[in-house]
């Protein structure tokens, strides 16, 4: 079969492109997805509070593992990636965070990326979004992505933890995606008004899947991209055990994410020549940056016992779960309708940082992100991690076999700045937790525990316990330097008819969760593919810290 466009990967970016390109009825699109449908009756992916479940199996999760990480006690660390219609938006934590305005302004200082400034990107964030409280200069009200804001009457620990951050001397913000990201405040989530996960399959594909010019093939594992010289002309893929090919008249659009996109490029003969020759892969184009510059967010949990019986601990007990499930299923309300990340914040840990370098997610229960190691008592925790680590990793294909996972090394914690930021983060978090707003709730420190105090003790805790925030990115970065893979429109350097459009093309990781920005990138490049005029630049005001101090004097100084 032949199509105008073939999209590889029905994830956060691929579904945006599929929906936008097929708005033109004379354009045909084939969307290939290695996973299955997003089964709407499967509570594991549809109930926000069940977000840990998809990470525990392989039905919706590629379940990659890293190579032994040399600065993390040689641990092989999780690298979960979504599999199925929706991609990682089908299994993520549903935090709707866009990044800091300064992230995009920094991108725009790079050669060839001048139109990626915050004010250039903001109209595309707005285009994608329907926020439940309506539109303003920063938010949309008619986009495919449903965004829900925290409501009065939610867990009181959210409010106490935000208040504690403010009492510790940090700013308060009423919108982490609005005028000012820096500070503590409520956190939006990608959840529908009926309490369902708002993946890009629900938001974008539901609008597009009935169109006759869109063909969606699930359980289609991409083998390689096909070339005629330097031009992409099709895709070879497996449907079960059957080898299939499809031809592309215009372009192949690679949207497989920061792990699989470089893997597919390399397997197709586009990447570092030495690696490809070592694996007996015919070199189509020597492009050394493919798979390099890999970045992620690392985070830790600081956990506390809760003296008041107000945490979500009872919701973890099996005998309470049928009632929670029924309320969610029939009413779309209650504990099940929230991801429980309803408060958080961004701060600068030192004056040398010109925009926030530390992120917080507050959670009114003590448990690991993947649902393991739940504390068997009332508790709460702060997830804290650095935002723009200087550590750089890589993704490398291991063989020609499409079913073999690649070699992944993030090289976490490879610089002294990493260690300084995480030590600072733990000590600052302890100051926040010691503020009067939490006196009523705060019991003993469960993890890391008050015995862990010196730099050496903190470092060992970090090495042993820090985990991925599941934000791999930047492995096919856009730009014009020698290690760039694509230009500012996603076109692969030195090739024709081939783009990469996903989190892998970020030149530097953003300050926050990646899903919203990945959707924005796809919306922006969709206009380029369609040769449309970009949306007019926003004129919204936004906060720049400048010489503003990192914090005011805390209400309760560190003891």
From Swiss-Prot:
Keyword terms of this UniProt record: FAD, Flavoprotein, NAD, Oxidoreductase
**Annotated spans, Disordered:** 182-202
- One GO molecular-function entry: betaine-aldehyde dehydrogenase (NAD+) activity
Which cellular components does GO assign to this protein?
membrane
Q: What is this protein called?
A: Oxygen-dependent choline dehydrogenase
Supply the Gene3D superfamilies for this chain: FAD/NAD(P)-binding domain (3.50.50.60), Glucose Oxidase, domain 3 (3.30.560.10)
Which sites are catalytic? Answer: 471
Concerning its family, UniProt says: Belongs to the GMC oxidoreductase family.
């Amino acid at each position: 079969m032949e199509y105008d466009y073939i999209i590889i990967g029905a994830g956060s970016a691929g579904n945006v492109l599929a929906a936008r390109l097929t708005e033109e009825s004379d354009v045909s699109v084939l969307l290939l997805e290695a996973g299955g449908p997003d089964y709407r009756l499967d509570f594991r992916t549809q109930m926000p509070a069940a977000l840990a479940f998809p990470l525990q199996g392989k039905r919706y999760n590629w379940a990659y593992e890293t190579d032994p990480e040399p600065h993390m006690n040689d641990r092989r660390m999780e690298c979960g990636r979504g599999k199925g219609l929706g991609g990682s938006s089908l299994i993520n934590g549903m935090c709707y965070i866009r990044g800091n305005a300064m992230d995009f302004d920094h991108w725009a200082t790079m050669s060839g990326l001048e139109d990626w400034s915050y004010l250039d990107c903001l109209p595309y964030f707005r285009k994608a979004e329907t926020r439940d409280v309506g539109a303003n200069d920063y938010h949309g009200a008619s986009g495919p992505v449903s965004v829900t804001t925290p409501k009065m009457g939610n867990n009181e620990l959210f409010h106490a933890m935000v208040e504690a951050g403010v009492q510790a001397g940090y700013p308060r913000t009423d919108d982490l995606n609005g005028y000012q990201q820096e500070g503590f405040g409520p956190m939006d989530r990608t959840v529908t008004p009926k309490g369902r996960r708002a993946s890009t399959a629900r938001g974008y594909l539901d609008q597009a899947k009935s169109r006759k010019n869109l063909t969606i093939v699930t359980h289609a594992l991409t083998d390689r991209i096909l070339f005629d010289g330097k031009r992409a002309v099709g895709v070879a893929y497996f449907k079960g055990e059957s080898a299939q090919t499809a031809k592309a008249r215009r372009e192949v659009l690679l949207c497989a994410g920061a792990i699989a996109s470089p893997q597919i490029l390399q397997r197709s003969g586009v990447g570092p020549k030495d690696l490809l020759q070592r694996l007996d892969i015919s070199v189509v184009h020597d492009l050394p940056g493919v798979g390099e510059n890999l970045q992620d967010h690392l985070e830790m949990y600081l956990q506390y016992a809760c003296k008041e019986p107000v945490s979500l601990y009872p919701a973890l007990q099996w005998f309470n779960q049928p009632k929670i499930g029924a309320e969610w299923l029939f009413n779309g309300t209650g504990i099940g309708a929230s991801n429980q990340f309803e408060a958080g914040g961004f701060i600068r840990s030192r004056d040398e940082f010109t925009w926030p370098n530390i992120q917080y997610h507050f959670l009114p229960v003590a448990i690991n992100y993947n649902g393991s190691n739940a504390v068997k008592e009332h508790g709460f925790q702060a997830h804290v991690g650095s935002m723009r680590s200087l550590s750089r990793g890589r993704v490398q294909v291991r063989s020609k076999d499409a079913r073999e996972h690649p070699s992944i090394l993030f090289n976490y914690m490879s610089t002294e700045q990493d260690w300084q930021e995480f030590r600072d983060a733990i000590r600052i978090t302890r100051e926040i937790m010691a503020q009067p707003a939490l006196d009523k709730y705060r019991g003993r420190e469960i993890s890391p525990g008050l015995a862990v105090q010196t730099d050496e003790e903190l470092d060992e805790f970090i090495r042993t316990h820090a985990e991925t925030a599941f934000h791999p990115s930047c492995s096919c970065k856009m730009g014009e330097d020698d290690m760039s893979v694509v230009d500012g429109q996603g076109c692969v350097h030195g090739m024709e008819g081939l783009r990469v459009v996903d989190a892998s093309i970020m030149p530097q990781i953003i300050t926050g969760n990646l899903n919203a920005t990945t959707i924005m990138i796809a919306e922006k490049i969709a206009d380029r593919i369609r040769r449309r005029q970009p949306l007019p630049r926003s004129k919204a005001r936004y906060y720049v810290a400048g010489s503003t101090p990192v914090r005011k004097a805390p209400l309760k100084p560190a003891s």
